[in-house]
């Protein structure tokens, strides 16, 4: 990496975003992450320091010091953003706002050439759309020309339908587009037939792994000496020991229910008398504090059997308990979840099983991150230089895509109206 191409990873987690950037030749100078296990996992794999920091309170000047005073090419990562749309300008009185406002202060202090912000789909409608609109307004006021898009990462080759909100911005005053989508996808729930080849299926993602072990410390050999498909080859690359960890069979608590489920079915497809008690309790639970979540506060579906010939549903922390293998009566193993998230088999995980699956579920898939990193290199005409091209425009919201569906919910329409107003030069807090 050129000495001028500084990458900083905030909210770095276990290093998924950073690993993908490293694969594209843009290894971060450092990561910053509050969780000790995730920070150590990052260091074990990314090959650059991870500073265990509380980004809600750290002084932005400290982050600037860690860069050696160099202006970054890009800052990657994103904090939770709930509840800050009604706060005053960078007002830290509400503790929920500490992370997002200090994140913005850090970005402003570092003044990177590019930024990539990633968050869950629920951010689209958080605070009636004003949380997202406020965030975009902050970036524009800092001098960034930004595009916002809800992206399904399966379109970039990830073997799961993982919807994420991405904001990409630059200080060059240039327009740009998101990376071209390379794949169609179908998880049985989310689907897009674009005429392009299907993204790798769940079965393709876990192919080549040997039978799951019962011993929690087992080193499990591959099912064959050679990779069985292109995705398996990518996952095996660099794993010199020819065995994998975290490929351990765990019996489902709801064994009888699991055996009755067909691919694509969930607990709610079973007769109510077979519902597990924990599912009954959770079915009545809602998120009450406005925090954007995977399911936007909706009721969970409990266990679900996945389709082997389709892409997986979104891998999150509970996946190793709730996602049932397509053909075996057991949940997915942690290793299978890691592969579906495109973490290679050589990746070394730090922490107990609960910590590891949470790290995996929280991560940006390295394969998607690599695609984004390569795209930045392609669209940045004078890569790494601190110059503005001739004809540069003023900072603005360049465009946004909230959904590809034909209809919109009332909540999403509210967000669209706010962003449309901003796109036309309005919307001031």
Swiss-Prot record:
The residue ranges crossing the membrane are none
A Pfam family found in this protein is DNA_methylase
Task: Name the EC number(s).
Answer: 2.1.1.37
List all Basic and acidic residues biased stretches: 282-297
Tell me the GO BP annotations in alphabetical order.
Answer: DNA restriction-modification system; methylation; negative regulation of gene expression via chromosomal CpG island methylation
The broad enzyme category this protein falls into is transferase
Entries under PROSITE patterns matching the protein: SAM_MT_C5
Tagged with keyword Transmembrane helix: no
Q: Does the keyword Methyltransferase apply?
A: yes
Q: Which UniProt keywords apply?
A: DNA-binding, Methyltransferase, Restriction system, S-adenosyl-L-methionine, Transferase
Q: Which domain of life is it from?
A: Bacteria
- InterPro entries assigned to the protein according to its UniProt record, in alphabetical order: C5-Methyltransferase, C5_MeTfrase, SAM-dependent_MTases_sf
Q: Which GO terms describe its molecular function?
A: DNA (cytosine-5-)-methyltransferase activity; DNA binding
Region (Disordered): which ranges?
282-305
Per the database record, which ranges form the SAM-dependent MTase C5-type domain? 5-383
Catalytic activity annotated for this protein? a 2'-deoxycytidine in DNA + S-adenosyl-L-methionine = a 5-methyl-2'-deoxycytidine in DNA + S-adenosyl-L-homocysteine + H(+)
Annotated active site: 81
Question: Member of which family?
Answer: Belongs to the class I-like SAM-binding methyltransferase superfamily. C5-methyltransferase family.
NCBIfam families named among the record's database cross-references: dcm (TIGR00675)
Protein name as it appears in the record: Type II methyltransferase M.ApaLI
Species of the source: Acetobacter pasteurianus
